[in-house]
Amino acid sequence: MSLQFNPIGLFLVALILLGVLGNNNSITISATLLLLMQQTALNKYIPMLEKYGLTIGIIILTIGVLSPIVSGKINLPNLSEILSWKMALAISIGIFVAWLGGRGINLMATQPLIITGLLIGTIIGIAFFGGIPVGPLIAAGIMSLLVGKL
């Protein structure tokens, strides 16, 4: 079995280097795993990852967010805390961001060309500004507001 060299493979190598230089494990690990998948017999699973990867990632992210509550490190708020202005603002922002993410998925589905620009911006944000890869959905949601698309 010989390695296949192609533009996507070189792009993934560049992402790995950016991840290492930017000290960002998430981009380094993600790009490395995708490169290994692309260059080996695991490439047959890439369509499945493409289809379900975002859903699986959101599930894992949600588990990570909820685990401090389950472990007891964060207590559920009492009624007076739920009724505070900070909690109301947090709930409102959560609703707004979830709504933006939904708009983002719709925009990415209807205008796939935009995905390239959003991914490049997200990669730069991850590699150099300490961001995390939830950016494309929110960025696409903001983009949908700016271009007026659902």
Swiss-Prot record:
InterPro entries: UPF0756_TM (IPR007382). Its main location: membrane. GO terms for cellular component: plasma membrane. It is found in: Cell membrane. Keywords: Cell membrane, Membrane, Transmembrane, Transmembrane helix. It comes from the Bacteria. It is a multi-pass membrane protein. Disulfide bonds: none annotated. The chain crosses the membrane at residues 1-21, 52-72, 82-102, 114-134. Belongs to the UPF0756 family. This is UPF0756 membrane protein HD_1071. It comes from Haemophilus ducreyi (strain 35000HP / ATCC 700724).
